[in-house]
Amino acid sequence: MDVVIRQTPKEVAQLAATIMARYVSEGKNIGLATGSTPLLTYQELIAKHREGLSFANTTAFLLDEYVGLPEDHEQSYHYTIYNEFTQYVDFADGAVHTPDGMNPRTDEAGREYEEAIEAAGGIDIQLLGVGTNGHVGFNEPGSSFDSLTRLKTLHPQTRRDNARFFGSLEQVPIHVITQGLGTIRRAGHLLLLATGENKADAVAKLVEGPVSAMMPASVLQLHRHATVIVDEAAASQLQETEFYRFVDANRPEWQAY
């Protein structure tokens, strides 16, 4: 695992966008996340598109979707990613995929999403955030490290965290369809971003704590190519910051970001 510390959320986003842009420029498949953390990264990617970066040969897969929200609902992730990112770049029609949260057979929707990822050749880089309880995607504590895309029940803490987007806790869906930890682990490169002091505990546990299903994000410790980029606030509970900074300052040229 490569841990990179930057001063501000903007610097986190700039580095993340630089990494993502390399994959996009090669027409690779990318995995997208929603939530507040990736927003600055998407803004940076939009700026790179305006400077000439094309997404025309890139296929994208979202991590998750709420069950029961139609695609045009303002809090569906299909709508959110369009509103915040994809409408501003040049993805080809049909190149951005979202789990089908309106399929009454959620088991079928999960299987179809897995098949779509496999048919595209897999995900080359997956952008991730982390919840305050350590969830990635909507893989809540206790999720199997081998799990695939499936129906999940949201943790009460996750529903409370997301209530700000819906206006009230009662409006937050209880169920989601999410890529599993096993699905996420198959991506070639995992790129997790975290900013803010409220993520410091989760960051410390996912990076330096034991690998545990109760801390789903700790699965990154098992991945062959995982990068964690955090700002100073999110890094505040890490014990090995001196080492992480030393590694970052002394990268060989072929490893430089």
Curated annotation (Swiss-Prot):
The active site is at residues 64, 133, 135, 140. GO terms for molecular function: glucosamine-6-phosphate deaminase activity; identical protein binding. It catalyses: alpha-D-glucosamine 6-phosphate + H2O = beta-D-fructose 6-phosphate + NH4(+). Pfam families: Glucosamine_iso. GO terms for biological process: carbohydrate metabolic process; glucosamine catabolic process; N-acetylglucosamine catabolic process; N-acetylneuraminate catabolic process. Its EC number is 3.5.99.6. GO terms for cellular component: cytoplasm. PROSITE patterns: GLC_GALNAC_ISOMERASE. Pathway: Amino-sugar metabolism; N-acetylneuraminate degradation; D-fructose 6-phosphate from N-acetylneuraminate: step 5/5. The keyword Membrane does not apply. Keywords: Carbohydrate metabolism, Hydrolase. The keyword Hydrolase applies. It is an enzyme of class 3 (hydrolase). Catalyzes the reversible isomerization-deamination of glucosamine 6-phosphate (GlcN6P) to form fructose 6-phosphate (Fru6P) and ammonium ion. HAMAP family: GlcN6P_deamin. Belongs to the glucosamine/galactosamine-6-phosphate isomerase family. NagB subfamily. This is Glucosamine-6-phosphate deaminase.
